[in-house]
């Protein structure tokens, strides 16, 4: 079984070309006990609360064993902490794993010999979904979703597909489905292109934007657990939609900061929007702790 590995080895510089390096990098499987992502969101108006968001992933023997999403909400002198833990239970021989949240929503994954999910049964209080995952050379290339009609309903099954494309182990594009509420916008399927930098992804971090792309957003924890295929070879430095126009442009840049051992300690996400007349920016800073 291929286990997740998210910590660093010492970097050894070889006399090879950039093309040779991008063709494949062997990354050892160091131990990890925790990954923590923290982001402070400052309010932009009176009566709106500041929020600190944290995601904590916990591991034992390189397997994900716990996950908690926490929000610390602050209004004036009042602070409230809201925690959303996830229970993780593996089946015999780790051939399956079930994620259960605090309200009883379950996601049961079937794992192959490499530890990658091949299918998932999602069940909430009022909805069931089915997912299948496809891989090419170990990389996740397709996620298929079926939303089952509610019991007693005459509605048809709703299907969505997310496709991912790679070049030399680096993600170069995703094609995501148009959701029902988007159908009137004329967008159809949405293609997003990605640019890889020179920093090798030693810690095997997923791209944040990809993790939030529907329907992969339903499997964020599995993505960070290494259950959805090989990690990209290099850290992503930029993403942008394939379709833009003279009246709309968008580009997001990802800038990582590292410690002396090349361990990522923060990620700055900067998105630039243009409407043909002016440019606006949305900036985020995410702190990263890896133990």
Ranges and model annotations:
Residues 12-15:
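C-terminal motif of bacterial Sec signal peptides marking the signal peptidase cleavage site
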Residues 19-291:
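Buried hydrophobic residues that stabilize the cores of well-folded domains
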Residues 1-4:
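Positively charged n-region of N-terminal signal peptides that target proteins for export
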């Amino acid at each position: 079984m291929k286990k997740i590995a998210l910590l660093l080895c010492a970097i050894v510089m070889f006399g090879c070309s950039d093309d040779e390096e991008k063709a494949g990098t062997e990354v050892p499987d160091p131990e990890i006990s925790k990954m923590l992502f923290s982001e402070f969101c400052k309010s932009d108006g009176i009566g709106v609360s500041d929020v600190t968001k944290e995601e904590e992933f916990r591991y034992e023997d390189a397997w994900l064993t716990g996950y908690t999403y926490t929000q610390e909400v602050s209004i004036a002198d009042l602070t409230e902490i809201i925690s959303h833990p996830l229970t993780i239970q593996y089946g015999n021989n780790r051939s399956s794993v079930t994620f259960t949240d605090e309200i009883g929503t379950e996601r049961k994954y079937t794992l192959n010999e490499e530890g990658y999910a091949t299918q998932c049964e999602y069940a909430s209080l009022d909805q069931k979904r089915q997912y299948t995952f496809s891989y090419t050379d170990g990389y996740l290339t397709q996620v298929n979703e079926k939303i089952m009609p509610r019991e007693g309903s005459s509605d048809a099954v709703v299907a969505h597909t997310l496709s991912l494309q790679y070049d030399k182990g680096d993600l170069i594009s995703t094609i995501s489905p148009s959701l029902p509420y988007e159908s009137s916008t004329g967008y159809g399927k949405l293609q997003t292109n990605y640019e890889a930098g020179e920093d090798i992804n030693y810690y095997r971090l997923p791209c944040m934007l990809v993790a939030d792309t529907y329907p992969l957003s339903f499997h964020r924890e599995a993505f960070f657990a290494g259950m959805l295929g090989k990690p990209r070879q290099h850290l992503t430095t930029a993403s942008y939609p394939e379709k833009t126009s003279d009246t709309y442009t968008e580009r997001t840049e990802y800038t990582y900061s590292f410690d002396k051992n090349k361990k990522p300690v923060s990620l700055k996400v900067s998105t630039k929007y243009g409407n043909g007349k002016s440019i606006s920016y949305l900036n985020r800073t995410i702190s990263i702790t890896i133990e």
